[in-house]
Amino acid sequence: MRKLSLVVLLSLLNAASAEQSYLVDWDAVGREAIDHLVELVKIPSVNPPGNETAVAEYVRAVLVAEGIDSKLYALDPTRANLVARHEGNGRKPPILIMGHTDVVGVQPEKWDADPFSGIREDGYIYGRGTLDDKDNVAAGMMVMILLKRLVVELDRDVIFLAESGEEGTPDVGINFMVEKHWDVIDAEFSIAEGGQGVIRDGRVHTFGIETTEKMPRRVTLVARGTPGHGSMPRLDNAVMILANAVAKASAWQTEMRLNETTETYFRRLAAISPPDEAVLYENVTNPEMTLAIQQQFLETFPYHYSILRTSVVPTVIDAGFRRNVIPSEASAILDIRMLP
């Protein structure tokens, strides 16, 4: 979280006049940003139903205390988006910083701690939204705060958008802002979630930049068979048929395909990695080594395995209503992320 805020802010400060210099206590900034992240995590905004307005109101209150104007835009009054702007001299088009205020659902019984507690322990913060995406909301908010405190003069406006509905309901969030309020978020480019940062020994080792995205697709597999009593096995048991289909889909290794971005990524990663890792990155396309490398990625570096191919992952299985009854139908959802 702290590293992200520093990277974003430094990129903006570097865009200012070379004659300007800013004295910043980054440790203090980091602590302040983390304090805000904890408070954001404490606000439940599970989508559905959302309740993102509560998060937006917190952000607005923090910005108001810093003398920063902001405005809420809502298709649904409980699911507001927040926009704030730091004005530059207008020589260049604006830059947009984004973070989404909703989070995915939780199964509290699976958690060791309350998912909305923001507990700090052993250098970690525990809670839903710490990684997706209230960390970016806190970072974006801190960018706006520091630009204001330091009176940073830029050649472009900096816009901060805390959006609702990213987790599956964009009609109240980014779609609404684009279709109805494009003028307040129109920018030359945007900094948002995506890419990946790696910290080693307390320092940033790599910071990946996303140039395009996979396309998400959902496929539902449905198996039908003859219902009956669990004491009498059947060859057309819908659960058995579905299980075999899911197993085949899980074992299917789609074709590996690199593009200019991933080729550059592995080449540069090899140059800064330990020898035992570098050899993997250097030989991803080596016909004699690629299968073994891909298998190692699958076992130990799933992120690297995924960016090489379209992924097919079963996520939800639905079957049966009694433990002693063979159901007539069973279904499974496959989460497919297609290479561009």
What are these regions (language model features)?
Residues 2-7:
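Sec-dependent signal peptide recognition
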Residues 9-17:
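Hydrophobic h-region of N-terminal signal peptides that target proteins for export
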Residues 19-130, 137, 147-156, 334:
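Acidic/His- and Gly-rich active-site-bordering loop/insert found
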Residues 34-38, 53-56, 60, 137, ...:
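Extracytoplasmic/secreted envelope proteins and their assembly/folding machinery
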Residues 125, 131-208:
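Acidic/histidine-rich catalytic neighborhood of metal-dependent amide-processing enzymes
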Residues 182-186, 195-204, 210-216, 230-316, ...:
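Acidic-enriched catalytic cores of C-N bond-cleaving enzymes acting on peptides and small amides
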Residues 326-340:
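C-terminal catalytic subdomain
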